UniProtKB/Swiss-Prot annotation:
InterPro entries: Sialidase, Sialidase_fam, Sialidase_sf. A motif (FRIP motif) lies at residues 78-81. It is a peripheral membrane protein. Substrate binds at R79, R98, E265, R281, R342. The active site is at D104 (proton acceptor), Y371 (nucleophile), E395. It catalyses: Hydrolysis of alpha-(2->3)-, alpha-(2->6)-, alpha-(2->8)- glycosidic linkages of terminal sialic acid residues in oligosaccharides, glycoproteins, glycolipids, colominic acid and synthetic substrates. The keyword Phosphoprotein applies. GO terms for molecular function: exo-alpha-sialidase activity. This is Sialidase-1.
Length: 416
């Protein structure tokens, strides 16, 4: 049965001609007003905002933000890109600056660059967190903004691999001035304990619709102590944090083999019905060489096994991927589109909440490519309306994907 659209009024009744009594005359006046509104500039703009026929993604610019090989601050390797747009329209790009080697372990900085002109120019690299000479240093991470307060939160983990250390910690820094300055690190162990939680890598979200409108959600994965995917939640603008329940790997708490169920690095986004989709790395290729998709209907208080699916269209070589939902209902997804190797960084999009994907794709880079992160810039920027832009920050190389981190700017409507 097709539901009647809110506010729709039937003209007349079946079996009898429509009569313009007082009620019908009023309805006719309403429909005339709506018709005139749709012809107005405001109405045309509103329709264009959700007109999927306008969507023709086009890469309009690309630039390297970081190059590995001790070329920037004697950093050996830059990895794990994160990108976000702040409520004020500033772009913030983050990466792990691995001091001595490309290893996931070892000492690191968190590198940051800012753009205030929609990605055209970027500030010099700033190192906003330094873990010293820690043998099992920091690992990024997830970034999320609160649209009410304007605060940007950045999460990372310490001692994730228990290499030369015994206690894992989830750490948090924040900025109240669009990334110009940052707080001292806050250890969340008193709030959430010391089980290893690896945020992201990618972006968190703030709920835009009920249930729990305004909630901040940051999802990640654990290890043998608490493997699988689970999320950190805040209902007080980031003052306090707690875990929602998660989806565990199978067999739980034991080493995994090929084809075991083991969801890993993940990226959440919200659908217009208020549900949250978590697109996750399929660490052991359970069921397919593709992405695991989880869905929560209560703002990530719970994740249920019956709401876990697999997306065979999103072929994946076991990697952290980018995913984002635009305000007009488009879902974008980026990953190295190959079943085995980290090559062919590809952008895909969906007009059906991710239940299917358009046949058209945009190849961002054909060669070695690894992790990627997505952000959008929509609506008014600096008081001026603009066409929506998508930003793809990704690991890129000619021989190895760890050679650099590059930014591709994509015009969603294909306009320059």
């Amino acid at each position: 049965m097709t539901a009647e659209r809110p506010g729709a009024v039937p003209l007349g009744r079946p079996g009898r001609p429509p009569m313009l009594g007082l009620g019908e005359a009023y309805r006719a006046q309403v429909f005339a007003s709506i018709f005139l509104l749709l012809l107005s500039p405001a109405g045309v703009g509103a329709r264009a905002k959700n007109d999927f026929n306008l969507v023709h993604p086009l890469v309009t610019m690309e630039q390297l933000l970081w190059v590995s090989g001790k070329q920037i601050g004697s950093v050996d390797t830059f990895r794990i890109p994160l990108i976000t747009t702040t409520p004020r329209g500033t772009l913030l790009a983050f990466a792990e600056a691995r001091k001595m080697s490309a290893s996931d372990k070892g000492a690191k900085f968190i590198a940051l660059r800012r753009s205030m002109d929609q990605g055209s120019t970027w500030s010099p690299t700033a190192f906003i967190v330094d873990d010293g000479e820690t043998p099992d240093g920091l690992n990024l991470g997830a970034v999320v903004s609160d649209t009410t307060t304007g605060v940007v939160f950045l999460f990372y983990s310490l001692c994730a691999h228990k290499a030369g250390c015994r206690v894992a910690s989830t750490m948090l820094v924040w900025s109240k001035d669009d990334g110009i300055s940052w707080s001292s690190p806050r250890n969340l162990s008193l709030d959430i304990g010391t089980e290893m939680f690896a945020p992201g890598p990618g972006s968190g979200i703030q709920k835009q619709w009920a249930p729990q409108k305004g909630r901040l959600i940051v999802c990640g994965h654990g290890t043998l102590e608490r493997d699988g995917v689970f999320c950190l939640l805040s209902d007080d603008h980031g003052a306090s944090w707690r875990y929602g329940s998660g989806i565990s790997g199978i067999p739980y708490g034991q080493p995994k083999r090929e084809n075991d169920f083991n969801p890993d690095e993940c990226q959440p986004y919200e659908l217009p019905d208020g549900s949250v989709v978590i697109n996750a790395r399929n660490q052991n290729n359970y069921h397919c060489r593709c992405r695991i998709v989880l869905r929560s209907y209560d703002a990530c208080d719970t994740l249920r096994p019956r709401d876990v699916t697999f997306d065979p269209e999103l072929v994946d070589p076991v990697v952290a991927a980018g995913a984002v939902a635009t305000s007009s209902g488009i879902i974008f997804f980026s990953n190295p589109a190959h079943p085995e190797f980290r090559v062919n960084l590809t952008l895909r999009w969906s007009f059906s909440n991710g239940t299917s994907w358009r046949k058209e794709t945009v190849q961002i880079w054909p060669g070695p490519s690894g992790y990627s992160s997505l952000a959008t810039l929509e609506g008014s920027v600096g008081g001026e309306d603009q066409a929506p832009q998508l930003y793809v920050l990704y690991e890129k190389g000619r021989n190895r994907y760890t050679e650099s981190i590059s930014l591709a700017k994509v015009s969603v409507y294909g306009t320059l």
